[in-house]
């Protein structure tokens, strides 16, 4: 069965293909299509944004669509950047700009107050509009410098204390086993067959 992942983010596409592919699903993404809806993320939560995207794309394509909304919540910043994680430094800014702004905002924050979590809300929608939405998290803290080259987004700053490594220092399989997206996919997997009626 085909599932379309509603993203053009190559990093996310790779993670979804690895995880859903092993379950036997044919995974496509918006990178495989010339046209697709551009959903405005007007939700105030990760779950609301994920559902907006999956419902609109499922109606457009006539197939099951999986979308995510994910980001970083930093406790010392009252949960920011939150749903604005991708545009923390402004519209069309790079990961480097977002990471630089995060380090700037936390410059005077000691290590014990730099707790944070990655959050991923996944929403799988049928063309009928019915959705299945789950949430996964990965706890950690924000480091003082970027380390690692394997990830994307805030991964080089996100330290996992139990491993003493950043998310960007992990291999894809190591990250998938503990990541917020991996946790959300495990929850989704448990309900996927029933939801899709297979």
Curated annotation (Swiss-Prot):
Enzyme class label: hydrolase
Record flagged with keyword Protease: no
SUPFAM superfamilies in UniProt: ITPase-like
Cofactor: binding details: Binds 1 Mg(2+) ion per subunit.
Biological processes, Gene Ontology terms: nucleotide metabolic process; purine nucleoside triphosphate catabolic process
CDD domains documented for this protein: HAM1
Binding site for substrate: 7-12, 70, 152-155, 175, 180-181
EC number: 3.6.1.66
Cofactor(s) listed: Mg(2+)
InterPro entries per record: dITP/XTP_pyrophosphatase, ITPase-like_fam, RdgB/HAM1
Pfam families recorded: Ham1p_like (PF01725)
Family label: Belongs to the HAM1 NTPase family.
Subunit-level organization: Homodimer.
Function of the molecule: Pyrophosphatase that catalyzes the hydrolysis of nucleoside triphosphates to their monophosphate derivatives, with a high preference for the non-canonical purine nucleotides XTP (xanthosine triphosphate), dITP (deoxyinosine triphosphate) and ITP. Seems to function as a house-cleaning enzyme that removes non-canonical purine nucleotides from the nucleotide pool, thus preventing their incorporation into DNA/RNA and avoiding chromosomal lesions.
Protein name: dITP/XTP pyrophosphatase
